From Swiss-Prot:
Pathway: Amino-acid biosynthesis; L-arginine biosynthesis; N(2)-acetyl-L-ornithine from L-glutamate: step 3/4. Gene3D superfamilies: Dihydrodipicolinate Reductase, domain 2, NAD(P)-binding Rossmann-like Domain. The active site is at 149. It catalyses: N-acetyl-L-glutamate 5-semialdehyde + phosphate + NADP(+) = N-acetyl-L-glutamyl 5-phosphate + NADPH + H(+). Keywords: Amino-acid biosynthesis, Arginine biosynthesis, Cytoplasm, NADP, Oxidoreductase. Pfam families: Semialdhyde_dh (PF01118), Semialdhyde_dhC_1 (PF22698). GO terms for cellular component: cytoplasm. Catalyzes the NADPH-dependent reduction of N-acetyl-5-glutamyl phosphate to yield N-acetyl-L-glutamate 5-semialdehyde. One of its GO terms (molecular function) is NADP+ binding. This is N-acetyl-gamma-glutamyl-phosphate reductase. SMART domains: Semialdhyde_dh. It comes from Alkalilimnicola ehrlichii (strain ATCC BAA-1101 / DSM 17681 / MLHE-1). CDD domains: AGPR_1_C (cd23934), AGPR_1_N (cd17895).
Amino acid sequence: MIEVGIVGGTGYTGVELLRLLARHPEARLRVITSRGNAGTRVDELFPSLRGEVELAFSEPDVDRLAACDLVFFATPNGTAMQMVPDLLARDTRVVDLGADFRLKDVETWSRWYGMTHACPELVAEAAYGLPELNREAIRGARLVANPGCYPTAVGLGWLPLLEAGLVETRGLVASCVSGASGAGRAANVATLLCEVNESFKAYGADGHRHLPEIRQSLAQVAGGAVELTFVPHLVPMTRGMHASLYATLRGDAGDLQVLFEQRYADEPFVDVLPAGAHPETRTVRGTNLCRLAVRRAPESDQVIVLSVIDNLTKGAAGQAVQNMNLMFGLPETAGLDAPAVLP
């Protein structure tokens, strides 16, 4: 049984981790921390977990966390990097759901996140936790940088085309929408019901923090730099993410439906829909699935890929558990096999 700790358990990502780990057949929650709610029982703050999690929140303590086999950080950016070196030194493995170890260029990270990195020597070691791309590196990792939600949806959508060299790496466009939970659980006027309901807006069009992460991931697949326009949008739903991806084909690309089906045939968490289908966010709610559809634009050399995930599950906590499974040699689907919640 894997002894697990969670640092930062009161945000939406943290409670999603709790939900998944509570029923995981090979993991046992040992420590769950929160500076603001130390001493409060988990099921008092989250009644949905009554009978599932019997722990109380505690102050972060390196000694208690180091007694775990693995620690998840579901914390604001800049938090994990303060504690990770001590945990790794004591043979505790780490999955960071924040952005502290995602970008391999430390100067780029500092520019986008507005702080100096506390342990730049560990950045190169961290495995980027997109299993469909980096499965073998994750298996042997001490430290995994869990991808962001947008980079997951976008990366899985473009992966087959870029691997095969079938699209131009200039002029890529990603138009994405996310539910309000992507903005976090902290009070924020911009995500109040009366502000979000019956509305639709773009944000971060002049530079979202996930942009350099998406570029880095796509460049790894393409074998060189990519030119990308990325525009995220906020929609009035709680959870879910939809990415509409556009690229220019290079010559005769063949049967794209077959390409996608073959690339993801053995991937337990990627579902390529039948030709002509359109993926819906409601069909992945609460699951670790990414559902994809690919098609050519009529009378054009453009290809369109549609990608949906649950931003809290495959876009965060579910993918983190998937990475844990790989790190400890467990079945990759352990604890992640529940179907979507409908309606």
